[in-house]
């Protein structure tokens, strides 16, 4: 067992009951283009086209052959683009059950399948995009290979679902997915989990590793740091446990599996719980009649690292397994910094809230102040369990010093790995965004 001591278990109210319920009927689904780092689409459809489930919607010019497919059958009603014609979303109005089918196999055949057969089926179904590289968090090139695939079978994000509940429902598919991953690499498949028992693969190159501790103990970046440190030469791939289930279902049934169990939670959710929905689901549909009155912010993903779901982006992200909702913190409090703060959380214990052990806080979107200088008072070191110098790294990101940032470990990280640093930063810096700018510069400069 690898125990993480540094980090933060965010004491936020609105945790979900760990029972899976059926979500509301989803009328619209979407693929969000900006989730895929560096992707430039070649469109295969236009507004008004009827599409089948698993039909190709677009391909990636920058990553030849990688296909992005429809999560449901229906009619393309929107293709949204932003500045410089960046693809924001392709929206489908759900209708019908038509779908593209694929080859299916017996469970005993999967581990012995040829790697090219597996790759072809994953690419054609669109499930290849469930894999992400580290460094850079991109969809892997089709002809690339890796010595390490990390399965994130735990979740320490605030308000998250317990993965074992979902995996237990789909044991055969989960094991089948692990067998497929084992055949996809000549190296190892690292299944990273909490202390709970999970169904396991019998393949010799599939290893289980137990992690314990506060967030970010459940992130792929943390697992890689301790088991297979990555750099420009050592590239690892990662995948979440629900996509492993989707891999297994694809090969066992010959059909694209797009079901997704998400946590709908937060201080302003009427009944926080786990809901069964689909990849790319409209969050307007999913949260209908579920939220308390007032101005709220719906977030696809974690409150720490998720994306605001509004307008063309109001859909469940490809890599997200929770929907978090916070009240918009627009109310200003006169001399708020001088009050005792019984109902306020602070990592530096600046308020009385820390005295009441186990207290949960109705957190909002407020940053409690305006932007200011980055002040190194030890906050970053409290929440960074990786063996690196966070203050120096974050300063380099602010300054745009890519060479020094690489030396200090920037290539190991993804935006979610710095989310806690953003949360505890007294200067209100968005370190995930700065990291992405740094990584993009490194890619451009070769």
UniProtKB/Swiss-Prot annotation:
EC number: 7.2.1.1
One GO MF term: oxidoreductase activity, acting on NAD(P)H, quinone or similar compound as acceptor
UniProt entry tagged with the keyword Translocase: yes
Any one biological process term the GO annotation gives: sodium ion transport
Similarity-based family: Belongs to the NqrA family.
Subunit structure: Composed of six subunits; NqrA, NqrB, NqrC, NqrD, NqrE and NqrF.
Identification of the protein by name: Na(+)-translocating NADH-quinone reductase subunit A
Organism: Vibrio campbellii (strain ATCC BAA-1116)
Native organism taxonomy: Bacteria, Pseudomonadati, Pseudomonadota, Gammaproteobacteria, Vibrionales
């Amino acid at each position: 067992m690898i125990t993480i001591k540094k980090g933060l278990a965010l004491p936020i109210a609105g945790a979900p009951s760990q029972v899976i319920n059926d979500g509301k009927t989803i009328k619209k689904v979407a693929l969000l283009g900006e989730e895929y780092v560096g992707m430039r689409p070649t469109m295969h459809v236009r507004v008004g086209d009827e599409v089948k489930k698993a039909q190709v919607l677009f391909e990636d010019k920058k990553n030849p052959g990688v296909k992005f497919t429809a999560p449901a059958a229906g009619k393309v009603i929107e293709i949204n683009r932003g500045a410089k014609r960046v693809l924001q979303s392709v929206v489908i109005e759900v209708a019908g059950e038509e779908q593209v089918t694929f080859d299916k196999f017996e469970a005993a055949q999967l581990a012995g399948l040829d790697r090219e057969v597996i790759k072809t089926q994953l690419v054609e179904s669109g499930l290849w995009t469930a894999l992400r590289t580290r460094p850079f968090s991109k969809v892997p090139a089709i002809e690339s290979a890796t010595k390490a695939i990390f399965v994130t079978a735990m979740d320490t994000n605030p308000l998250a679902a317990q993965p074992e509940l979902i995996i237990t429902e789909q044991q055969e598919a989960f094991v089948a997915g692990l067998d497929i991953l084992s055949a996809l690499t000549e190296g190892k498949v690292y299944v990273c989990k909490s202390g709970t028992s999970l169904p396991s693969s019998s393949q010799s190159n599939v290893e289980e590793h137990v992690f314990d501790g506060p967030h970010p103990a459940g992130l792929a970046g943390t697992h890689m740091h301790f088991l297979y440190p990555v750099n420009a030469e050592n590239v690892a791939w990662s995948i979440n446990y629900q996509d492993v289930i989707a891999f297994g279902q694809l090969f066992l049934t010959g059909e694209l599996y797009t079901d997704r169990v998400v946590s709908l939670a937060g201080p302003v959710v009427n009944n926080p719980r786990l809901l069964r929905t689909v990849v790319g689901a409209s969050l307007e549909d999913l949260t209908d009649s579920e939220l308390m009155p007032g101005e709220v912010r719906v977030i696809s993903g974690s409150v720490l690292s998720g994306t605001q779901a509004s307008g063309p982006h109001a859909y469940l992200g490809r890599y997200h397994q929770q929907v978090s909702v916070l009240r918009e913190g627009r109310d200003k409090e006169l001399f708020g910094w001088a009050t005792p703060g019984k109902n306020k959380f602070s990592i530096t214990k600046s308020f009385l809230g820390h005295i009441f052990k186990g207290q949960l806080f109705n957190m909002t979107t407020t940053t409690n102040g305006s932007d200011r200088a980055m002040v190194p008072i030890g906050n970053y070191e409290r929440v960074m369990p990786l063996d690196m110098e966070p203050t120096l790294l974050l300063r380099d990101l602010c300054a745009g010093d890519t060479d020094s940032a690489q030396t200090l470990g920037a290539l190991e990280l993804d935006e979610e790995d710095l989310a806690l640093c953003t949360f505890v930063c007294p200067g209100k810096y968005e370190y995930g965004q700065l990291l992405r700018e740094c990584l993009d510069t490194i890619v451009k400069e070769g």
